[in-house]
């Protein structure tokens, strides 16, 4: 009985730990809208830049994806998804907003 109780407690702790780092999808999408990201990116489809689901698929399993994408969003870049460059978004988009948006994209 004690072992069962310990197992249930450990499972509950893991579930809560997973939720602590979870991104609020609605809030993140609202940040993307507010900061103009959705003018060039769709969630499920390409607009000017790639759709966010395509970005998530490309970086699935890449443990360095978050850092790479944050750097790309801040500095801008070209040649990865087509000929149209993405403009730099720093400093006019807050670092914490960029991080939240990137974390959300990677959950799609």
Residue ranges of model-derived segments:
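The canonical Cys-X-X-Cys-His
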Residues: 36-43, 101
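Positively charged n-region of N-terminal signal peptides that target proteins for export
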Residues: 1-4
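Electrostatic cytochrome c docking/interface patches
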Residues: 16-32, 58-60
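Stable alpha-helical elements in mature extracytoplasmic
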Residues: 24, 28, 65, 69, ...
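Axial heme c-ligation environment in periplasmic c-type cytochrome domains
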Residues: 48-59, 72-102
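Bacterial N-terminal signal peptides
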Residues: 7-15
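Short hydrophobic/aromatic patches at helix-to-coil boundaries
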Residues: 104-108
């Amino acid at each position: 009985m004690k072992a069962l109780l310990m197992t249930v407690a450990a499972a509950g702790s893991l579930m809560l730990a997973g939720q602590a780092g979870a991104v609020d999808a609605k809030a993140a999408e609202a940040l993307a809208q507010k900061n103009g990201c959705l003018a060039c990116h769709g969630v499920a489809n390409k607009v000017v830049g790639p759709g966010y689901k395509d970005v998530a698929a490309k970086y699935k399993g890449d443990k360095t994806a978050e850092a790479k994408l944050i750097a790309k969003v801040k500095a801008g870049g070209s040649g990865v998804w087509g000929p149209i460059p993405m403009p730099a978004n720093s400093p006019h988009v807050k670092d914490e907003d960029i991080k939240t948006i990137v974390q959300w994209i990677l959950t799609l």
